[in-house]
Structures are given as C-alpha cells and as structure tokens.
Amino acid sequence: MSSGGLLLLLGLLTLWEVLTPVSSKDRPKFCELPADPGPCNGLFQAFYYNPVQRKCLKFRYGGCKANPNTFKTIEECKRICAA
C-alpha cells in the first residue's frame, strides 16, 4: 500500500474513532441482544435497548427467563444501555 493510501486509512480510522460515541464503547454487550419475551405467558410491559434505532423501546415480557436486555422501566434501560 502506498504512503498516500496509508495516510487515508489512518485518517479514516481517526475520524471513525472521533465520531463513535464514547457511550457505545462502554455499553454492555447484552444491550445488543434482541427483545426476549421469555417462555412464560404473562403480559408485562418491559423495555429493551434497540442498537439499530439507538434507543429503548417497549415490548411485551412474558414474566420469566428473559435475556439481560430486559428492563422494568425506560429510565433503567436508558441509564444502562443508552447513556
């Protein structure tokens, strides 16, 4: 690769680092999991972080055995995953 190509690559990597929000680097990996209602049949309102939309969304939670990306309140979801 030529020195010009290396400089371009270095510039792009630097730009990526600057534009990537600090919070996404520190966000727990479980925040990337999909909404998981679990196997139970309850109808509870819960929240999960949607990494594509970059926000917390409502979903119906069955009441048991969901993944860690399940929160009782939108505030808790935002504090942990969307900060």
Curated annotation (Swiss-Prot):
Disulfide linkage: C31-C81, C40-C64, C56-C77
Superkingdom of the source species: Eukaryota
Pfam families, sorted: Kunitz_BPTI
Tissue: Expressed by the venom gland.
GO MF term (any one): serine-type endopeptidase inhibitor activity
Annotated site location: Reactive bond for chymotrypsin: N41, G42
Secretion signal, residue range per the UniProt entry: 1-24
Subcellular location: Secreted
Domain BPTI/Kunitz inhibitor: 31-81
Family classification: Belongs to the venom Kunitz-type family.
Role description: Serine protease inhibitor.
Name by which UniProt lists this protein: Kunitz-type serine protease inhibitor blackelin-3
Native organism taxonomy: Eukaryota, Metazoa, Chordata, Craniata, Vertebrata
